[in-house]
């Protein structure tokens, strides 16, 4: 794909994936990772898609929003787990959700704080709560990425 030829960093297909075909599309397009959203999938279906992606050599970012979903991700052996602080039903965000639930994540997993990032203070707050990575979207669309990216990546 065009993105693959222009990017030297890992690529994530961020979509509401529910079929093997979508995972095959991601692989064919050059993605390195796919997003599986536990709020979108039944646990059995999640495990099937998770295993299928790994069989193709793709990494999986598992998105959670509840403690029950974190438990499912942990039981599957997920090594890249996000806590989405945006409720997909109401679209309300709560930075405190990551702080409340981060300790439930498998200690060996890479912990991803998803959503609610608007300022460098938000990135610092997530980092202090145990996040290894912050997934940023809206802030990059509503602000100047040339300013935000250096600020956000300066948080160690």
Show the residue positions of the predicted features.
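Glycine-enriched alpha-helix->loop->beta-strand junction motifs that scaffold or abut catalytic
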Residues: 6-9, 28-34, 54-58, 75-82, ...
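Catalytic cores of alpha/beta
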Residues: 18-30, 65-77, 113, 117-136, ...
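Glycine/Thr-rich beta-alpha phosphate-binding loop at enzyme active sites
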Residues: 73-102
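A cross-domain feature marking catalytic cores of carbohydrate-active enzymes
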Residues: 13-15, 38, 62-64, 85, ...
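Shared catalytic-loop signature of beta/alpha-barrel
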Residues: 65, 71-73, 90-95, 135, ...
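Glycine-rich phosphate-binding active-site loops on the catalytic face of alpha/beta enzymes
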Residues: 25-45, 82-91, 129-150
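C-terminal helical cap(s) of enzyme catalytic domains, especially alpha/beta-barrels
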Residues: 100-105, 127, 141-156
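N-terminal active-site wall of soluble small-molecule enzyme domains
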Residues: 1-61, 69-72, 98-101
